Amino acid sequence: MTDSSTSHPLDLRAWLDEARALGELTDVSGADWNLELGAISELNVKKERPAALLFDDIPDYPQGHRVLTCSTASPARLSSILRVGHQPTHRALVETLRGKPKQWQAHAHEYDPVTAASGPVFDNVQTGGDVDLFSFPAPLWHEKDGGRYIGTGCMVVTKDLDSEWINVGTYRVMIHDRNHVGLDMIPGKHGAIQYDKHMKAGKPFPVAIVIGCDPLGYLISGIEVPFGMCEYNYIGAILKKPVSVVKGQLTDLPFPSASEIVIEGYAHPGDVRIEGPFGEFHGYYPGKAETAPVVTIERIYYRNNPIIMGSPPAKPPNDYSYSKAVMRSALLVDALQAAGVPDVAGVWRMRSAARACSTWCRSVSAMRDTRGRRDTFSASAAWAHTCRAIRSWSTRTSIRRIFRR
């Protein structure tokens, strides 16, 4: 089925125009991919009303090769992303979302993605020896990270071995070299289940990683949908319109036709490398660097002047803790009322509690900083580096503008 006129390409640039019109987007010029982007983003999201940040003029890269952070971190932007009308306050947004996830899930089967013949994502194609992940300003987000993470606000597209189930999940993606990335998937996650099935069968695991599209894509790929359901269907139910996808030339996996960057390849049986450590959502470096699947990248597709969607974790509040808190607050209100709890005036699940306790308990026993102590990491080291390193007048001016808001 091909009908792009009635489908949605998940175009990030269309959403950026909307965010700018709302007064919710700030341009930052001259920040370095090496720690500065991460430190500025972390300090920004600690504000009461943080703007989305669009970084350009990044050292070592052509003008127009950009990075976006903090996309979901305000009620105005999140309500825009979820297509629920302008909601100016946390409480209004939570109330508006009550019952919505159940509705979206119930109608998801009506919105199979629509395959388009082509799309802007194919403006440029790297193949073979031309593949170079360092063509893009993937940040080193935290000082002690194991490498540059091109995938934080990403969508990892995979397929089941023995069915037609397409899964779209968010897993961190670290660059090893010009054509290899590490893919960290927590055991039990749907992508990890599909990966394990391929490995047990001795077959290569096809992967397409979307590095930037409408934030709705990243938002839904990072939540829990029922086993066997494709996230594209869920997104379509929110949009009330199918997602427009194109097929990868290598793997035939579907990805949004207006994606900014897509890297495509295979994880081969037995091919693992050390990945991490990485400063995570609870404000710690959990555990130590460990082996993770390696994806050999054989194709890169990207738009002219591509934009990386970044979502760097940090001690809450962080880049995505607001969206998690809002979504889970809405679910909690519904659960309380369904349980017969009277006189519920409102619910707010704290951002520091926006992840499951099981995740926290599993991680906390192994949390160490790189000096061997149990301790938090924060932006302090990165920010100290930033203060030393920022020499550009334009960058300093951009930062002052951010923190006057």
Q: Where do the model's predicted regions map?
A:
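Extended, highly charged
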Residues: 2-405
